[in-house]
Each structure stands twice: as C-alpha cells, then as structure tokens.
Amino acid sequence: MRATEFIAEIDRRGFLGALGAGAMAAAGVPAEAKPRKPEPMAFLSAHMEAEEMLHKTALHAGMRGAELAQFLAQCYHESAGFGRMHEYASGAEYEGRQDLGNVNKGDGVRYKGRGFIQITGRDNYRRAGQALGLPLEERPELASRPDVAAKIAVWYWASRVRPNVANFNDTRAVTQRINPKLNGLADRHENFKDYKNMFVATRTGT
C-alpha cells in the first residue's frame, strides 16, 4: 500500500474526516482511492495507531516540514506500512558479525532488525538502549513495540541522519543514511511527496 492510499484509508475510517474532501483532494488523494490489497479493519487500525505514535514522537523531537515528511516516508517504507516491526529473515545471516557487535553464539538471531527504522546487531541495541534508558541489549524484543520503536527511530534519525543531510528534500541523501544500497528509493520518494503534500493541504507538519 502506498502512503497516498494509507492516508486515504485513514480518512475513510474517520481519522481525518474533519479535513473534508477538498483538503484530501489538494493532497492528491483521490476520493475513490482504495488499497491494492484490502486489509481487515483491526489490522489497518493497528497501522494507524503506530503511525500516530510515530508522528507525535517526531513532532515532540522538533521535526517539521520536509524533515518530518521524509522521516515518516522512510519509516513507512522500512516497516512495510507501519505493519512490520521485525525483519522477515531469522537473523542467522548476522551470526558472527563482529562489526555489529555479535560476538556470542545466537546474537545474529537475537539482535536481528526490529522497529520502524530497523536496528540490527548487539552494538546498535546497546547504543540505543543507553541513549534512551531502556534495557534493549537485555531485552531486544522491546524494539518491536511501537512506542519503543518510535523512540528508537527518532534517536537513530537524530544521531545518524540529521547531522549528515543538508537538504531533506533530497530523498537519495536521506536514504543513504538508512539503506546504503538505496533499496526502494523510488517508493521512498513517492511516499515522501505524499506526506509533504498532505502537510500542505492540511496545514500540519509545520
């Protein structure tokens, strides 16, 4: 599901109903837009709650405008529409990766990617935990909780992305700080435009 479709679905469920059809049209969201893959209400609702939590955490951290749109777009892509809080693979491929701090047997699986911006490896869990005052090294599964994942994503952004990006309209530069191989670059950029247009139309995100 593209971010445009996600935003349209939020409106149909009443979360953005007060904005009116004009605002949604200005955001580039067709009134008849439908997800490519219909999702059960409970599943979709969980996605919306995760997005709302992430959005609020980012606003509290001072993100606005293009930076906020880019942050949400990147998290949307990384977490498959705010619905996947851990990577599909088992993590066995990270076994023995000393560059990630995986020095003990089983560390690859234990510290596989989790969260909106998925952190991977014992060292990254330790750093995030120390920065946030959370026992992530001892309890890595906490990184899959939306409230914790939102804090981790903002921490990662503030420490790894923001200091290294001069222009948040540059999706390539932002993506390089999150996924150096630039996987899904076109999708990330389209979602960035969707969020940016929504902020303009609804006068939010500023």
Which positions does each model-derived feature cover?
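N-terminal secretory signal peptides and thylakoid transit peptides that target proteins
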Residues: 2-22
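Boundary at the C-terminal end of the N-terminal hydrophobic targeting segment
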Residues: 31-33
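Peptidoglycan-targeting cell-wall enzymes and recognition modules
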Residues: 36-48, 73-156
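N-terminal carbohydrate-binding/catalytic regions of secreted carbohydrate-active enzymes
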Residues: 51-54, 58
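Acidic helix/loop microenvironments that form the catalytic cleft of cell-wall polysaccharide enzymes
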Residues: 75-78, 166-185
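Proteins synthesized as precursors that undergo proteolytic processing into mature forms
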Residues: 148-150, 159-166
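Low-complexity, Gly/Ser/Thr/Pro-rich intrinsically disordered linker/tail segments
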Residues: 194-206
